[in-house]
């Protein structure tokens, strides 16, 4: 059963939240003066509504500290540390004209609300080895959108093409299955203005909808969420000896931005990661890792928020777990083993931890299944583990050979 989606503003009087007979639960985003401060999912057990009283108690428990912190931040507002940058927003896509249309409509709605003295964002659509002209036709409906075609198939080929075409001081990436929040520009601007030395920025990513079992399972396991506290990441992370190798520290590639000149100086994205169906993952984690290892700060800013359309069916979700989160992640770690001798022991420890953690997770959900408790389908977790095994056993080397062949065929 689906989860009803609610977007609440705490400075407005709370009301009962109505639920239909089709709603198995509710997903609630809480804001204070448009700033996101909390998100949670809760089962509703056939109830007709969530009362305002129950809602107030839940908000106090989940968001009370953040609401107070936001009120203090508002009172102690400090001047911007540096001028607003010019921004290129890149949409790398392949054969998804519907998603591109939705994203462009939402993006230009946000752009129209910017202050008149703000730099006008540069919007770039990178069409990655398309099978037809539908995306070019979509981009052509927007007079200010630039369209380029990247003939070499693979997301990181498209990202590197965006880097070469970028005109902005900041290059932001939005996937074609997201839409930006109304505070997206303000969030990016706030992160930049108080972290002028940072080279990368990531933001909160919440579900666009929770209509299917696959979407609900994905979000219950954590989705792409990273919390509602701004985090500035540097060379070390106190208490985490595996840093910066893990996946949970940085944010998601669906919504990220970089200082363009730093991205260029680092050589752009590794085209042997995020190569499409063969290795559909790891490319965002790799560039985050390399930025940190090069000595640049990375800032996670929850106000820099987007909404993601999760995979709708279980087959799609299974492929995501197996290939993106298993194979892609382990290919990224294998690369780190090869290329970063100084951190090799830590990366090896992370690989061991990953397999142990996911094995324990699988066993835990098998027990829940036997007890008829709510659980993640074991087949998803087995697929993720198997993807990790395939990635560890030469996945990155095979991908490099494939990419070399693509470069020979399409210079």
Task: Pin down the residues of each PLM region.
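Conserved donor NDP-sugar-binding/catalytic core segment of glycosyltransferases
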Residues: 183-223
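A short, conserved alpha-helix in the catalytic core of glycosyltransferases
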Residues: 249-267, 272-304
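Short, well-formed alpha-helical segments that are part of the catalytic scaffolds
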Residues: 96-111, 115
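Glycine-rich, basic loop-to-helix element that forms the pyrophosphate-binding segment
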Residues: 135-136, 150-166
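Short, flexible, basic/aromatic active-site loop/helix in glycosyltransferases
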Residues: 221-248
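Non-catalytic, C-terminal membrane-associated alpha-helical segments of glycosyltransferases
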Residues: 320-325, 341-411
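A conserved acidic beta->alpha catalytic loop
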Residues: 106, 124-136, 178
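Short aromatic/hydrophobic "clamp" motif used to bind/position activated sugar donors
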Residues: 171
């Amino acid at each position: 059963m689906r989860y009803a989606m609610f977007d609440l503003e705490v400075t407005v009087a709370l009301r009962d939240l109505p639920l239909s007979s089709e709603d198995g639960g509710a997903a609630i985003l809480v804001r204070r003066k448009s700033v996101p401060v909390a998100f949670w999912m809760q089962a509703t057990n056939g109830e007709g509504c969530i009362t305002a009283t129950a809602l107030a108690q839940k908000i106090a428990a989940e968001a009370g500290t953040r609401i107070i912190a936001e009120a203090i931040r508002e009172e102690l507002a400090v001047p911007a540390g540096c001028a607003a940058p010019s921004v290129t927003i890149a949409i790398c896509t392949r054969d998804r004209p519907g998603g591109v249309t939705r994203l462009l409509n939402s993006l230009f709605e946000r752009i129209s609300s910017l202050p008149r003295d703000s730099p006008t964002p540069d919007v770039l659509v990178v069409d990655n080895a398309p099978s037809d002209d539908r995306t070019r036709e979509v981009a052509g409906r927007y007079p200010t959108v630039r369209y380029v075609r990247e003939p070499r198939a693979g997301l990181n080929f498209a990202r590197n093409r965006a880097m070469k075409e970028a005109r902005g001081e900041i290059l932001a990436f939005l996937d074609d299955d997201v839409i930006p929040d109304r505070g997206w520009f303000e969030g990016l601007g706030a992160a930049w203005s108080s972290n002028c030395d940072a080279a990368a920025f990531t933001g909160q990513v919440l579900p666009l909808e929770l209509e299917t079992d696959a979407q609900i399972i994905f979000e219950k396991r954590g989705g792409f969420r990273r919390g509602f506290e701004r985090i500035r990441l540097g060379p070390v992370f106190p208490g985490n000896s595996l840093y910066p190798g893990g996946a949970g520290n940085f944010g998601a590639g669906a919504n990220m931005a970089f200082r363009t000149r730093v991205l260029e100086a680092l050589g752009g994205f590794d085209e042997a990661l995020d190569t499409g169906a063969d290795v559909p993952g790891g490319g965002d984690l790799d560039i985050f890792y390399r930025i940190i290892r090069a000595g640049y700060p990375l800032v996670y800013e929850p106000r820099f928020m987007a909404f993601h359309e999760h995979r709708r069916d279980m087959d799609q979700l299974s492929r995501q777990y197996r290939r993106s989160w298993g194979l892609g992640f382990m290919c990224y770690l294998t690369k780190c083993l090869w290329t970063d001798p100084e951190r090799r022991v830590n990366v090896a420890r992370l690989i061991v931890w990953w397999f142990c953690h996911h094995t324990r997770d699988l066993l835990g959900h098998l027990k829940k299944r036997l007890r008829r408790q709510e659980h993640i389908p074991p087949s998803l977790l087995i697929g993720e583990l198997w993807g990790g095994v395939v990635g560890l056993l030469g996945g990155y080397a095979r991908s490099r050979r494939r990419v070399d062949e693509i470069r020979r065929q399409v210079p």
